[in-house]
Amino acid sequence: MANLQSKSSSAKRKRRHFRVRAKINGTTSVPRLNVFKSNGHFYAQLIDDVKQKTIVAASTLKMTGLKSTSNIAAAEKVGDEIAKKALDKKVTTVVFDRGGYLYHGKVKAFAEAARKAGLKF
């Protein structure tokens, strides 16, 4: 008989991420904007998949003045910071890789803040 138990949410996220990564690829001119959420922090990085190098990165690890490092406001702050760093490196257009997360809550707030700060995707 087939296993009828549902898979964990992290396993579902990993499946979604592999499916999305098969379709998108970052280049030097249009890098991939990747996000990762942990229980305590929010991370983002611009990746050139051709050279396999991280161009810029931002996270809540070293941010000060935040009430919480894992809420929507923190994600928006990371979105602003990654956009400013990307524009300093002359990167204006990116491909958004939501990391298998649903486009809702922190991920959506991050994306909207990055767009508002000047990134195009």
Curated annotation (Swiss-Prot):
UniProt superkingdom:
Bacteria
Q: Mention any one GO cellular component term assigned to this protein in its UniProt record.
A: cytosolic large ribosomal subunit
* CDD domains in UniProt: Ribosomal_L18_L5e (cd00432)
Q: Which residues form a coiled coil?
A: none
Q: Which Pfam families match?
A: Ribosomal_L18p
GO molecular-function term, one example from the UniProt record = structural constituent of ribosome
Q: What keywords is this UniProt entry annotated with?
A: Ribonucleoprotein, Ribosomal protein, RNA-binding, rRNA-binding
GO BP field:
translation
**Could you say which protein family the record assigns here?**
Belongs to the universal ribosomal protein uL18 family.
Which HAMAP family is this protein grouped with? Ribosomal_uL18_B
Question: Which NCBIfam families did the record assign?
Answer: L18_bact (TIGR00060)
Its biological purpose is as follows: This is one of the proteins that bind and probably mediate the attachment of the 5S RNA into the large ribosomal subunit, where it forms part of the central protuberance.
Q: How does it assemble?
A: Part of the 50S ribosomal subunit; part of the 5S rRNA/L5/L18/L25 subcomplex. Contacts the 5S and 23S rRNAs.
User: What protein am I looking at?
Assistant: Large ribosomal subunit protein uL18
